[in-house]
Amino acid sequence: GVEAEAEAEASEAEAAEAAAAEEAAASAVIAAAPEEEEAARLAWQARGSARGVPDPAPASLFEGWLGQMRRLFSPTFFSTDASGNLVPGLEQLPPTAEGAPPLLLLGNHQLFGFDGPMILEELLRERGVALTALVYPPLLEAESPLAPLPYPLPGTAATFERFGAVPASGRALFKSLSRGEHTLLFPGGGREVFKRKGEAYQLFWPDSPDVVRLAARLNATLLPFAGLGGDDSFEISLDSDELLASPLVGPFFRERVAKMPSLVQDDVFVPPVGTILPTRYYFAFGAPLPTDGIDPA
């Protein structure tokens, strides 16, 4: 009767209000996007200038793509407070002032590796921390390792260089931490960037504790983090193994992969083919783990 109709109308009104609120929030995000992108661009430019790397103009195709990914995936960051609770933002990260132990950020890598630039950008923008990122060496080469296939996108090497990226190796990690630089390392490397079908969020980390021993030797603080969303953002149609086995494109990829280094078991620089499924990225930084009490031997 009347009560049922009133309840129905109230429910419709509440739904309309909720929809209007969501639309207003979305409009606010869209309106703020240019400001966030400009802040990110200026942060990148400042980092590059400090390293003597000129800021390219106009922005590279890779940077334009990153801007689109930022809007599409809306990364959200959390850190762990003294009580062990996750709180929004990065204010709870350990001190990073001069003289503080270097931080070694360790976490899972997500499909296609967009998480790396997102973390670098957020740490620089929110905390003023310029990380040194250890990346797959071919990503820092001027020519695409898969040429003439334009992957990675033009401008990737220059952007990574401006952001302080260095070719990943044990020696590079030692140099970075010994200089007191806060460092980002994805132990799973390219193997996690180009996961196969059915491997969402699986870790492919080496069994060796060498990284922990090195951190202890240099009195670095381990800062573990977990990333979510990236492996849900792509539906893989053909994974790396299927492309390598393809009679059509397999010879092309096999020839190029044979010339590239392998840093993690079974890593191959062959991007899967699939569909983008926009999903928010989440990054949760855990409590810091000092290594001053660990025997590096």
What are these regions (language model features)?
Residues 10-122, 127-171:
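Membrane-anchoring hydrophobic helices of lipid-metabolizing enzymes
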Residues 3-5, 10-41, 47-65, 175-297:
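Non-catalytic C-terminal accessory region of glycerolipid acyltransferases
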